[in-house]
Amino acid sequence: MQPGGAPDMSALLAQAQQMQQQLMAAQQEMAQAEVTGQAGGGLVVATVKGTGEVVGLQIDPKVVDPEDVETLQDLVIGAIEDASRKAQEVAAEKLGPLAGGLGGGLPGLPGF
């Protein structure tokens, strides 16, 4: 802070720019990260990018039963949900420290 309690705007701007760069780097890491989720003890495995995009699905032939399509559908949904949950955990892990840095806002600027 400068004399009189006014915030040092150049320091605040530098801090904001640094946080923006860190956020962009974390977002890039998330976009490249892939996580897998499974259901049925690994009979169905889904691969999801950190962005939530489903990029892979493996189904063990043992679980394919034309007489019981509903079970296969449930397993696919379960595997995708598991992978999506893990992708959200990765996002929280990568973005959490940055969000914590924003928790106090920008000192000296109300509403930020």
Swiss-Prot record:
The keyword Cytoplasm applies. Pfam families: YbaB_DNA_bd. Keywords: Cytoplasm, DNA-binding. GO terms for molecular function: DNA binding. The keyword Hydrolase does not apply. It comes from the Bacteria. Signal peptide: none annotated. It is found in: Cytoplasm, Nucleoid. One of its GO terms (cellular component) is cytosol. HAMAP family: DNA_YbaB_EbfC (MF_00274). PANTHER family: NUCLEOID-ASSOCIATED PROTEIN YBAB. Belongs to the YbaB/EbfC family. Homodimer. Binds to DNA and alters its conformation. May be involved in regulation of gene expression, nucleoid organization and DNA protection. This is Nucleoid-associated protein RER_03900. It comes from Rhodococcus erythropolis (strain PR4 / NBRC 100887).
